[in-house]
Amino acid sequence: MNIKFLHIIIFVSFLLPACQQGKRQPDSTSNVHHVVVCWLNEHGNKEARQKVIEVSRGFSAIPGVIDVRAGRVIPSEREIVDSSFDVAIYLSFENEQKLFEYLNHPIHKKAVEKMLKPLVRKVVVYDFIE
């Protein structure tokens, strides 16, 4: 199997459906936080890193998104800190339903397909609710 194709499959499997919870009903009253940690195809590439950051900030135009933050890693010598990634993205939503809507929104889908997938080799997503 082509290694690039495998990376794309892994990327899609983490980024798109990682936040969906089967048939469980979303909590409609609590803020939801969505943290996306990205490793670039070309680790340390400043242009690619900036592109991911800029594209991510555009997610603020999606209804239900309260806040979007994106930035680069802070290198650290501390053992507990994983500073192997390139970019982290943080989004907050009004509730779980808005997170699900964001994942399927055309702006998000287009950004993932056209701009992020070509630049990112690995993604890890953390979702939590207050």
Which sequence ranges carry the predicted segments?
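Bacterial N-terminal signal peptides that target proteins for export
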Residues: M1-H7
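Intrinsic low-complexity/disordered segments
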Residues: K4, P17-A18, S30-N31, H105
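Bacterial N-terminal signal peptides
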Residues: H7-P17
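Short S/T/G/P-rich N-terminal loop/turn motif that feeds into the first structured element of a domain
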Residues: C19-F85, E94-K98, F128-E130
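An amphipathic, aromatic/His-enriched active-site/gating alpha helix that lines ligand/cofactor pockets
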Residues: E54, A61-P63, S92-V125
